[in-house]
């Protein structure tokens, strides 16, 4: 049997992992400006953590979860999304305690798992970056979080992004709308897809979100959630819209957007961009004021979003956005002869300890091959070290771009290479 990676997974090789590191580092920098701190949760959880919070009737739970019984007969699932594990952690670690500053702001990044048909930008093991904010029901929190997502997408270079906005109201408004939707869809049941016929019984709002052609036709004239908002829900949504407008953020009201998870209420949103004629959601989230209490904590408001890293990178690639990845070596040492081997090791280590990104040849190759390696690594400077240089303790350092050279001592390189680096036209941080 030829050993290969499982279907729906990928190896992220060095040429690509640099892009991942850039995106993750960029997200950390943006989130830090908004006072978010990182939280890391296990990649597997008790099955009930996901099934009861995400919703027993959602596609994630009924079709897509990787779940199993471990050797202790505990029902375990690989996490399919990030919010439920973070809420579980928030409650379990009593981060709702009075001494913890509110609102509490967390971000996470890491692998998630869903058993679905692999396609471009969607894998069975995928990676998500997300944020969760606990303790504020102020609509300004909704807006701040949405704007933070927009800030990230704009600064990283995603183009043509449109904000789609909707509300699911409070539980009372949602219940009234749910019944109106059932009344509207029941006479049309036979025209719906099989999945939507099931959803009509279990979670009728999910019919609005269906991508099937027959379902899209059926919901064209469906009642709007906006007609069923009570005063509290209307006031909250109006405040969100007004604040977005005050900040100059354009949005589209999308009453068919419901999100695929059951825990949302009030504001929900998606950032969508068009790629090759298809609308792709790059980031999505919303408010979930009942989830902390559902996990056994006190009544606590919550708001958050998630974005898929694979999809984000796919969109950046399709839009021709080149991430500013710095892979260049500062120094490459070409080694000539066995007599230079030990000194080359000492020298490259001294350079690294001074903070330079340095590499040397280990394969005793001809100089031409070593110089080619220096070019492949985009080395800024090149040192050729042979037995004669070791004996004289003098070496030539070359700017590998302009070919300018300086003659220096090995001691200077070992102790103060930054002076030479700057003399050759480069700047140290």
UniProtKB/Swiss-Prot annotation:
InterPro entries: aa-tRNA-synth_II, aa-tRNA-synth_II/BPL/LPL, Anticodon-bd, Anticodon-bd_dom_sf, His-tRNA-ligase, HisRS-like_core, HisRS/HisZ, HisRS_anticodon. It is found in: Cytoplasm. Its EC number is 6.1.1.21. Keywords: Aminoacyl-tRNA synthetase, ATP-binding, Cytoplasm, Ligase, Nucleotide-binding, Protein biosynthesis. It is an enzyme of class 6 (ligase). GO terms for cellular component: cytoplasm. It catalyses: tRNA(His) + L-histidine + ATP = L-histidyl-tRNA(His) + AMP + diphosphate + H(+). Its main location: cytoplasm. Coiled coil: none annotated. One of its GO terms (biological process) is histidyl-tRNA aminoacylation. Pfam families: HGTP_anticodon (PF03129), tRNA-synt_His (PF13393). Signal peptide: none annotated. GO terms for molecular function: ATP binding; catalytic activity, acting on a protein; histidine-tRNA ligase activity; transferase activity. It comes from the Bacteria. Homodimer. Belongs to the class-II aminoacyl-tRNA synthetase family. PANTHER family: HISTIDINE--TRNA LIGASE, MITOCHONDRIAL-RELATED, HISTIDYL-TRNA SYNTHETASE. NCBIfam families: hisS (TIGR00442). This is Histidine--tRNA ligase. The lineage of its organism: Bacteria, Bacillati, Bacillota, Bacilli, Lactobacillales. The gene is hisS.
């Amino acid at each position: 049997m030829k050993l290969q990676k499982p279907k729906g997974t990928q190896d992220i090789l060095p040429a690509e992992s640099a892009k991942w590191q850039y995106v993750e580092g960029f997200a950390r920098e943006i989130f830090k400006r908004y006072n978010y701190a990182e939280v890391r949760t296990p990649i597997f959880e008790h099955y009930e953590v996901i099934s009861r919070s995400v919703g027993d009737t959602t596609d994630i739970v009924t079709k897509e979860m990787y779940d199993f019984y471990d050797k202790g007969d505990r029902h375990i699932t690989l996490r399919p999304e990030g919010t439920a594990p973070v809420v579980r952690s928030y409650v379990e670690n009593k981060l709702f305690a009075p001494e913890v500053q509110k609102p509490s702001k967390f971000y996470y990044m890491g692998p998630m798992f869903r058993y679905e048909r692999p396609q471009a930008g969607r894998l069975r093991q995928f990676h998500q970056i997300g944020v969760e904010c606990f303790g504020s029901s102020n609509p300004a929190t909704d807006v701040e979080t949405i704007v933070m997502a927009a800030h990230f997408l704009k600064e990283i270079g995603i183009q043509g992004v449109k904000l789609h906005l909707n509300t699911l109201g409070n539980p009372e408004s949602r219940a009234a709308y749910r019944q109106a939707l059932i009344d509207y869809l029941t006479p049309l049941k036979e025209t719906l897809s099989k999945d939507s016929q099931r959803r009509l019984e279990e979670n009728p709002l999910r019919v609005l979100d269906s991508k099937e052609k027959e379902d899209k036709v059926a919901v064209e004239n469906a009642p709007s959630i906006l007609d069923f908002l009570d005063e509290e829900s209307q006031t909250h949504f109006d405040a969100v819209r007004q604040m977005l407008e005050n900040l100059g953020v354009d949005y589209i009201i999308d009453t068919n957007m419901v999100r695929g998870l059951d825990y949302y209420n009030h504001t929900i949103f998606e950032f969508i961009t068009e790629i090759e004629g298809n609308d792709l959601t790059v980031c999505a989230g919303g408010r979930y004021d009942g989830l902390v209490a559902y996990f056994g904590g006190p009544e606590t408001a919550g708001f958050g979003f998630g974005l898929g890293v694979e999809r984000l990178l796919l969109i950046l690639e399709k839009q021709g956005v080149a991430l500013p990845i710095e892979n260049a070596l500062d120094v490459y040492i070409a080694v000539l002869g066995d007599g230079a081997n030990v000194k080359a090791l000492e020298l490259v280590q001294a350079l690294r300890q001074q903070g330079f990104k340095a590499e040397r040849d280990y394969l005793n190759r001809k100089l031409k091959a070593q110089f080619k390696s220096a070019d492949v690594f985009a080395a800024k400077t090149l040192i050729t070290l042979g037995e004669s240089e070791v004996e004289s303790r003098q070496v030539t350092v070359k700017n590998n771009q302009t070919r300018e050279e300086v003659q220096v001592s090995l001691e200077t390189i070992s102790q103060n290479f930054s002076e030479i680096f700057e003399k050759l036209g480069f700047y140290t941080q």
